[in-house]
């Protein structure tokens, strides 16, 4: 049974641990070095932006908005030394799973549509492109499914 309450606040530790797991898994798979570290100014901005959305009172709409911001804002502001897109994808998926949903997407290296959207976000220097965020939100909305944990 899925709760009506949303796990709302995203904390730095949640994102940092996700980034470390992503990078260590990548290092194990490829043998490439893992550059683990946080750019604090960017992290502060990411957390502020993520935690200031998702307050409409409509659970599905709020979950979609928060997941979109987790993935989009991490990609845009680059709070980590490495692995920002991968961390955004995994963190958005974990957030949705914690709230009773799953994000059903192909691995990033096979997913040209997602890669294109995230590249557009990353290339914005001064402001977060709201049109691209709408595209990302639509992309995510088409891939959210109810999550039933195995018993």
Question: What is each model feature region?
Answer:
Residues 1-151:
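FIC/Doc superfamily catalytic core
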């Amino acid at each position: 049974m899925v709760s009506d309450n949303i796990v709302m606040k995203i904390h730095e530790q949640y994102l940092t641990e996700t980034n470390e797991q992503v990078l260590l898994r990548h290092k194990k798979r490829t043998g490439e070095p893992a550059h683990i570290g946080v750019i604090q100014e960017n992290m502060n901005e990411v957390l502020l932006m993520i935690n200031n959305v998702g307050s409409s009172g409509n659970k599905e709409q709020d979950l979609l908005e928060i997941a979109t911001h987790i993935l989009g804002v991490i990609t845009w502001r680059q709070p980590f030394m490495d692995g920002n897109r991968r961390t955004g994808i995994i963190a958005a998926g974990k957030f949705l799973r914690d709230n009773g949903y799953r994000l059903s997407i192909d691995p990033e290296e096979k997913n040209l549509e997602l890669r294109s959207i995230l590249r557009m976000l990353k290339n914005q220097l001064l402001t977060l492109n709201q049109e691209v965020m709408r595209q990302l939100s639509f992309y995510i909305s088409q891939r959210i499914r109810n999550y039933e944990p195995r018993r």
